[in-house]
Amino acid sequence: MARIGLGDGWKCAFANDFDPVKAATYRANFSDAADHFHERDVWTLSPDDLPGRADLAWASSPCQDFSLAGARAGLTGGRSSAFFGFWRLMEALDDAGRAPRLMVVENVTGLLTSNGGADFAALGTALAVRGYRFGALEIDAATVLPQSRPRVFVVAARDAPANLIGESTFHTRAVRVAHAGLPDAVAAHWIWWRLASPPARNTDLAALLEPDDAVIWHSAAKTQRLIELMTPLHRARLETRSSRAVGAVFRRTRIENGRSIQRAEVRFDGLAGCLRTPRGGSSRQAIVVVEGGQVRSRLLTPREAARLMGLPDSYRLPATPTAALHVAGDGVAVPVVRWLARELLEPLLNPAAAMAAE
């Protein structure tokens, strides 16, 4: 999805994923995959597998990949995580004089706070030691898509033109706290990247849904069971709708009176909740439609999930719903990548053109 977001102006020289479902999906959507895609554990790759010197290296990995277990072993030691496997390659490229001009590390917002901020500091230290300056931006896909999906984008570069440094709404409180927790030697490499806010989102969840007669709805009994999982506050949200309303429902585990209780929570703000990889029916997001005093419910379809990630309907999804939702729920929002590329990454690669355009 990062490749689609970057756009046709970029050429992908190398891509890697160890997940067979994601690998098959990549091949199905990119006819040139055989030229550069490697379906392998990142730890089995060598610098010789990466051609030339890239303008950009992009890494998306689970938050737990920044575990201190990897840092304690040294950033080049042990098969601790996908990220450290990636970083081992970046170090080797740097040693060979082929370090990427830019890097982006994309992750969940927990990266900023995990292990009391020590994991974020470990990432910053790794970048700083190799001569990169870096800064973090917390961007919620809800700025451009009807899905609440906050993510952190750590952007690293060897040079930082003055016109790309400044204030940004994406310097959230969490980013500022993470920055404040960096060791002084690492903080000296920090950059407050200037990134403008994109135009206001002009679509909502209902606009991306498939027609009512093209989807499978829950039985009345199943819908009632879903409603019974709601607290009085959330049931009231259903009951107070006076006209057709479309909402998103997540099942969550809440602690109530010292016990773990499964709850269904509904929102009618035009946004879906953050898509997740499915681990059974309870983790799949549901849709409710309230109309004429009646409530209907169903599961979000794979195509709807893909639309919530900004993917075109021409994007080929895996055949099974579970696999398709896994691909969508583990991806990066396409329009967010495009905005980041247009407003920051591309100007970093061509600062003269960026300054002339201002």
Question: Where are these predicted regions, by residue range?
Answer:
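Class I S-adenosyl-L-methionine
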Residues: 1, 8, 47-54, 68-267, 355-358
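Short acidic, glycine/proline-rich loop/turn micro-motifs
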Residues: 6, 68-72, 287-289, 321
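SAM cofactor-binding core of SAM-dependent methyltransferases
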Residues: 1-43
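Buried hydrophobic packing segments
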Residues: 2, 6, 89, 336-344
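Short, solvent-exposed loop/turn segments at secondary-structure junctions
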Residues: 20, 62-65, 109-110, 143-144, ...
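Conserved proline-anchored active-site loop of SAM-dependent methyltransferases
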Residues: 1-3, 41-42, 52-70, 102-108, ...
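C-terminal target-recognition/interaction regions appended to catalytic cores
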Residues: 212-358
